[in-house]
Amino acid sequence: MTSIKQRDELQSTIWKIANEVRGAVDGWDFKQFVLGTLFYRFISENFTNFIEGGDESVNYANMPDDVITPEIKDDATRTKGYFIYPAQLFVNIAKNANNNPNLNTDLAAIFDAIESSANGYPSEHDIKGLFADFDTTSNRLGNTVEEKNRRLAAVIKGVESLDFGNFEDNEIDLFGDAYEFLISNYAANAGKSGGEFFTPQNVSKLIARLAMSGLASVNKIYDPACGSGSLLLQAKKQFDAHLIEDGFFGQEINHTTYNLARMNMFLHNINYDKFDIALGNTLLNPQYGDEKPFDAIVSNPPYSVNWVGSDDPTLINDDRFAPAGVLAPKSKADFAFVLHALSYLSARGRAAIVCFPGIFYRGGAEQKIRKYLVDGNFVETVIALPPNLFYGTGISVNILV
C-alpha cells in the first residue's frame, strides 16, 4: 500500500471510530478524549522507539519498571522532554482496557506521572498541563464509573486498532496528519467555533509559502494567535525542517487550544527544544518580545474582536503600537495584531496575515494605521480570497503580506 493510500484509509477509519465512540455526546465536546488518546499512543511509541534505538533485541514494553535506573530516566527526559515507564505505555494499558475496573484512575495517574516527569527539566513548560483537558471523571464519558470506563476503553481500543505501521518507518507524519484531519473535521462539524482554532489546509499552505517566499532559510517562525498550530506546521510541511533553524513559536489565549497546539507539535515529531507555545493574551501580555526578531510570521487572528485599546492609556506608548500614532479601535483589534506582528519581524522578515476586509476601507484610526503602513513601505501585497473557505463563516477574507 502506498503511503498516500495508507493515510487516506487511516483518516477514513479514524473519523468512523471517533463518531462511534462518542455515542450521543456532541463531537465537539468529546474531541479532547479522542485527540488526547491519539497523542498518548504517539508519545508512547515515540518514546519506545527512542529507548530501543533500533535494537530488535530490546522490547521496552515488556521490561519491568524496576530495571529503569535514575541515570536512564534522567538521560531520556533530557532528550525527549518526558519519561514513560514500560507499565505506563499505551500498548500495555490498551491490552486490558476492557477489563480494567480502575481504567479512569489509572489513566489519570499515568498522565499526571508523564507531566510530572518533566518537572525541573528544560521541557517542563512544554509538558506541563498537556493532559489537563482529558478529564477521566467527566460526565461526558458517562454517569457512573463503569460507564466512564466503558467509554474510555472504547476510545483506547479504537485508537489501538489504527494501523500506523512501524513507528520508525513512518515517513509522512501519519500521526500528525491523523491529528490534523480530526481537528479539521471537528472544526467543520462545529461551525463557527471551529474557525477559532483551525485554519483550513489550503489556506495555511498559501500563507506559509507567502511568508517564506524567496528565503533559503529562516531563523524561526511565529504565530501570535496560533490556535492549534496548523499554520506553523504548514511551514514545516512546505519546507525542509532544516530551513527553519531555531524552531516554531506561538501564543494562544484559549487554554484548551493551547494544549492542542503543543500536542500538535509533538505529533509532528518536533522535539520540545524546537518549539515554544505560550499561553496568554498576545496584545496585552506578549511573549518573545525580548528575543531575536522573527524572519517569518504567519497568522489568522480572530476577526474584529474587542480589546482594551484606548481604555489603557499605556498602550499608545507600547513599542508595537506607538509608531503608528494611534491604536486600533476597541471594537476591532485587527490592526493591533498586524502592528504586533510588524514589530516582531526581523529586518529581512515577512509576515502573511489573514485579515477581515473591513480594515482596508474603514475610516478613523484604521485609516491612519493604513497610511502608516503604506508610507513606511511595509506592505508588499494584499491578496483577496474567495468566500466560504473558512469554517463557520462565508465572508471573503484577505491576506496582508
Stretch-by-stretch model annotation:
Residues 1-206, 210-211, 215, 273-282, ...:
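Non-catalytic, mostly N-terminal accessory regions of nucleic-acid modification and defense proteins
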Residues 13, 20, 29-42, 327-401:
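Conserved Class I SAM-dependent methyltransferase catalytic core
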Residues 193-299, 304-306, 311-315, 320-324, ...:
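Conserved S-adenosyl-L-methionine
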Residues 34, 175, 218, 245, ...:
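A structure-centric signal for secondary-structure junctions around beta-strands
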Residues 104, 325-327:
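Extracellular loop and loop/strand-boundary signature of outer-membrane beta-barrel proteins
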Residues 15, 28, 258, 307-308, ...:
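Tryptophan-centered motif/residue detector
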